């Protein structure tokens, strides 16, 4: 059974990101204000939330800085998993009906691996740079097909909505657990997106009210320099200001994280591979219950 999840501020040392990015930027002179709708803000934001833009601006640009206009680079890399393979999740498997058989590939194990032990669904964030980097797009997409979301982790910059679409012949009723939704709407087959609104930074869960095994972590942070790995374990984060920065990776399914400090130079592509370890015995001990069923490679 899905449980409603919201962790205010996404504490837990998440990504080592200093309270979701409040420490990501260093002070700059106060900028000239800009107008967003009818509201005057110190700098642009990208927001589709039905809330006062000043709330978003205060969170993502706490120091009221002008947008960063200096040189940038790109950080990319491969995230792999070491240690034990992912255990099966028998409760999830048992809840998947016969007409959703392919969903077992998404939810049948604790985490998803690709070729070469590439690790999917890892949140990667870059912090520690100087300057305010505005988000460029007001929404992130979450597509449903075959009774599964297209990822088990989504990361949003605060201000973005999560836009859910049905990409097959099924309707879906998305629910962002932890958000104060007024009503649940149906994403009709191959129709328009349903907009979900996280009202503050934090950790949420996306599910489908008709298929509660469809679960994905949704992390809402205060900076735009982030990505989520696909099944190949790879990520790309552009628009990173030059200088020393911290690259942090977190797998929400296990809460294992790793970080590394690197230096970004103008126009350069910085390769930052990271490995996240999984210890089956330690995981079983933290769960405080019986070990999950054995997993075959």
Question: Across the structure, where does each feature detected by a protein language model lie?
Answer:
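Extracytoplasmic copper-binding redox domains, predominantly the cupredoxin/blue-copper superfamily
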Residues: 25-297
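Sec-dependent bacterial lipoprotein signal peptides
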Residues: 1-23
């Amino acid at each position: 059974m899905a449980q409603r999840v919201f962790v205010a501020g996404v504490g837990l040392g998440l990504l080592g990101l200093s309270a979701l990015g409040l420490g990501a930027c260093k002070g700059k002179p106060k900028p000239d204000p800009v107008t967003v709708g009818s509201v005057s803000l110190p700098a642009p934001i990208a927001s589709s939330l039905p809330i006062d833009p000043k709330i978003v601006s205060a969170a993502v640009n706490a120091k009221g800085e002008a947008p960063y206009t200096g040189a940038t680079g790109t950080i990319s890399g491969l995230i792999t998993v070491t240690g034990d393979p992912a255990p099966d999740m028998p409760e999830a498997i048992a809840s998947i009906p016969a007409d959703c058989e392919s969903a077992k590939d998404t939810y049948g194990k604790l985490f998803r691996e690709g070729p070469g032990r590439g690790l999917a669904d890892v949140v990667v964030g870059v912090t520690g740079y100087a300057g305010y980097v505005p988000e460029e797009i007001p929404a992130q997409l979450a597509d449903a097909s075959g009774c599964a979301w297209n990822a088990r982790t989504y990361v949003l910059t605060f201000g973005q909505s999560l836009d859910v679409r049905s990409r097959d012949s099924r309707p879906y009723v998305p629910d962002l657990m932890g958000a104060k939704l007024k009503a649940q709407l149906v994403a009709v087959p191959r129709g328009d997106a349903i907009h979900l609104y996280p009202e503050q930074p934090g950790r949420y869960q996306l599910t489908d009210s008709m298929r509660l095994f469809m679960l994905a972590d949704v992390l809402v942070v205060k900076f735009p320099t982030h990505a989520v790995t696909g099944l190949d374990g790879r990520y790309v984060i552009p628009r990173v200001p030059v200088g020393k920065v911290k690259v942090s990776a977190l797998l929400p399914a296990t809460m294992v994280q790793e970080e590394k400090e690197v230096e970004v130079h103008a126009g350069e592509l910085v390769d930052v591979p990271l490995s996240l370890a999984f210890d089956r015995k330690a995981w079983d001990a933290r769960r405080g219950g019986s070990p999950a069923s054995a997993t075959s490679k």
